[in-house]
Each structure stands twice: as structure tokens, then as C-alpha cells.
Amino acid sequence: MKDWLDEIKWNSDGLVPAIAQDHKTGRVLMMAWMNRESLALTAAEQRAIYWSRSRGKLWRKGEESGHVQKLHELRLDCDADVIILMVEQLGHIACHTGRESCFYRVYEDGQWKIVDPVLKDPDAIYSAGH
């Protein structure tokens, strides 16, 4: 039997883009990267675990903020090169800016307009004890 992780077309860095969506509304919350280990751990632990390219290590979503993403479903696209995670976003904040989604800007009249409010000050999110 073929390993399910072998079916994924990893990029030259051994990564695959992963899009987190709210499992109830379908809203796109964020995009991050996963490597083989982070995807396997995500499936095993039923929570989103990404690969931080800037830190060069596993990133358990919510480990600092408390805003864990509980996994409901994993999906692989037709080309096998993008993952979608259907998640329950604990705390309703996915973005490090304190917003529900990282996609809070809309292109309008030649510029990016902020359309989603900050739900919690990022300084308060990432301080001790969240």
C-alpha cells in the first residue's frame, strides 16, 4: 500500500502550501507551509502543525497565542500540490495581527483596503499567559 504522504508533490524544498479554512463557513483563514513531518503530525494530533520557513522548525499553530486550529478534514487538490485544512479556529483569531483571517485586505480602486477589524491587540495575544 502506498504511503499517503508519497502522493503529495512536494516542492524542491520539501514543502507544500497549506490553506486553512473555517470548517463551518469555508472562509480562508491563512496560508502556511507544511513539510512531511508537519503534515503527518497534523493528521496524528488532529491539530494544525506547520513548518516555519523563517524559524526553520515545526510551528504548532496556537503554541504561543492559544489560537489552536483543530483539524476536521484534510484535502488534497487535483494536482496533489496544495493541501486544504478544514479547521475549527479556537479563539476565532488566525492572524498574528489579531484578526480572524490573514486575508483582511481587499483590492479596491488601485489600493489595498483593510476590511476586517482587529479582534485582539497582538501585543496582548503574544504576551505571557496570552
UniProtKB/Swiss-Prot annotation:
Q: Tell me the residue numbers annotated for binding Mg(2+).
A: 77, 79, 81
Q: What does the UniProt cofactor note say?
A: Binds 1 Mg(2+) ion per subunit.
GO terms assigned for molecular function: magnesium ion binding; phosphoribosyl-AMP cyclohydrolase activity; zinc ion binding
Q: Which reaction does it catalyse?
A: 1-(5-phospho-beta-D-ribosyl)-5'-AMP + H2O = 1-(5-phospho-beta-D-ribosyl)-5-[(5-phospho-beta-D-ribosylamino)methylideneamino]imidazole-4-carboxamide
Q: What are the transmembrane regions?
A: none
Q: Name what cofactor the protein needs.
A: Mg(2+); Zn(2+)
Where does it live in the cell? Cytoplasm
S-S pairs: none
Single GO BP term: L-histidine biosynthetic process
| Record Gene3D superfamilies | Phosphoribosyl-AMP cyclohydrolase
Task: Spell out the InterPro entries in the cross-references.
Answer: PRA-CH, PRib_AMP_CycHydrolase_dom, PRib_AMP_CycHydrolase_sf
List its EC numbers.
Answer: 3.5.4.19
Q: Name one GO cellular component term.
A: cytoplasm
Pathway per the UniProt entry = Amino-acid biosynthesis; L-histidine biosynthesis; L-histidine from 5-phospho-alpha-D-ribose 1-diphosphate: step 3/9
Binding positions for Zn(2+) per the UniProt entry:
78, 95, 102
The subunit field of the Swiss-Prot or TrEMBL record says: Homodimer.
Stated role: Catalyzes the hydrolysis of the adenine ring of phosphoribosyl-AMP.
For this chain, the family text in UniProt reads: Belongs to the PRA-CH family.
Q: Which PANTHER family match?
A: HISTIDINE BIOSYNTHESIS BIFUNCTIONAL PROTEIN, HISTIDINE BIOSYNTHESIS BIFUNCTIONAL PROTEIN HIS7
Entry protein name: Phosphoribosyl-AMP cyclohydrolase
Print the organism lineage: Bacteria, Pseudomonadati, Pseudomonadota, Gammaproteobacteria, Pseudomonadales
